[in-house]
Swiss-Prot record:
GO terms for molecular function: 16S rRNA (adenine(1518)-N(6)/adenine(1519)-N(6))-dimethyltransferase activity; RNA binding. This is Ribosomal RNA small subunit methyltransferase A. The keyword Cytoplasm applies. Its EC number is 2.1.1.182. Its main location: cytoplasm. It is found in: Cytoplasm. Specifically dimethylates two adjacent adenosines (A1518 and A1519) in the loop of a conserved hairpin near the 3'-end of 16S rRNA in the 30S particle. May play a critical role in biogenesis of 30S subunits. GO terms for cellular component: cytosol. It comes from Streptococcus agalactiae serotype Ia (strain ATCC 27591 / A909 / CDC SS700). S-adenosyl-L-methionine binds at N27, L29, G54, E75, D100, N125. The gene is rsmA. It holds the Pfam family RrnaAD. The lineage of its organism: Bacteria, Bacillati, Bacillota, Bacilli, Lactobacillales.
């Protein structure tokens, strides 16, 4: 019997006296077919290391451990650590790290894999309230993850895969699409979770590009500029840039020059700029030494 079997899940929770904490956004998956589909979507095999975020009681971890070289699972809730030690006892290729993934030094952590040079894929069922910070943390870690296969609310998946001139488009769209392609693989109904969330989820598969979608002089500055443009979505690009960089005559002259170099109108909003537009703007701002 699988951990994800509903009767097994309930028995594990009862045996350990576990109660769900809303603050951790805990929803445990109880459908083995969907778990297998996640592993198949991520194309997990013995040539891959996996980082899992939020293993819960180990339902997905069990499937990952059977297929991957190694699994490193980050769990913030210390009440789940003894449960995972119990449910995953038969595996010698799983490390459970009792830590908030947002506070983890991932560059150091991945050295704990027996073979840290294998491609690393991230597989996770992320709580809605923290999906964006976690994805940004993973991207900003500069670790060349091969793939993210992540369960999330459809609204967040729409933001990640959004195109310019849409409500969903923003700095998250740019950050992910700069490095990766993003595509919804399938829908996960709310009925297969304990407890059931309020909405259905989707599995979003993000695959690293061979090269970033555009070339920029300074990646960190490029991402900074893209974030600045969306600080106040309803404001013009000019207003957001001057709010961030300053409103002195010298600064405004440099901003005008940079926009002229990048061939971008100051009156448009950030959501109208494509990723190549943001690349041109960031490089132009560097050129004028803002």
């Amino acid at each position: 019997m699988r951990i994800a079997d509903k009767t097994v899940t309930r028995a594990i929770l009862e045996r350990h006296g576990f109660t769900f904490k809303k603050s951790f956004g805990q929803n445990f998956l109880t459908d083995t077919n969907i778990l297998q589909k996640i592993v198949d979507t991520a194309e997990i095999d013995k040539g891959v290391n996996v980082i899992e975020i939020g293993p819960g009681i180990g339902a997905l971890t069990e499937f990952l451990a059977e297929n991957a070289a190694e699994v490193m699972a980050f769990e913030i809730d210390d009440r789940l650590i003894p449960i995972l030690a119990d449910t995953l006892a038969r595996f010698d290729n799983v490390q459970v790290v009792n830590q908030d993934i947002l506070k983890a030094d991932l560059q150091t952590q991945i050295q704990a894999f027996k073979n840290p040079d294998l491609p690393i894929k991230v597989v996770a069922n992320l709580p809605y309230y923290i999906t964006t910070p976690i994805l940004m943390h993973l991207i900003e870690s500069k670790i060349p993850f091969a793939e993210f296969v992540v369960m999330m609310q459809k609204e967040v998946a729409d933001r990640i895969s959004a195109m310019p001139n849409t409500k969903a488009y923003g700095s998250l769209s740019i950050a992910v699409q700069y490095y990766m392609t993003a595509k919804v693989s399938f829908i996960v109904p709310r009925t297969v979770f304990v407890p059931a969330p309020n909405v259905d989820s989707v599995i979003l598969k993000m695959v690293r590009r061979d090269q970033p979608v555009v070339s920029v002089q300074d990646e960190d500055f490029f991402f900074r500029v893209s974030k600045v443009a969306f600080v106040h979505r309803r404001k013009t690009l000019w207003n957001n840039l001057t709010s961030h960089f300053g409103k002195s005559e010298d600064t405004k002259a440099k901003l005008e020059k940079a926009l002229e170099i990048a061939k971008i109108k100051p009156s448009i909003r950030g959501e109208a700029l494509s990723i190549p537009d943001f690349a041109s703007l960031a490089d132009a701002l560097k050129e004028v030494e803002i």
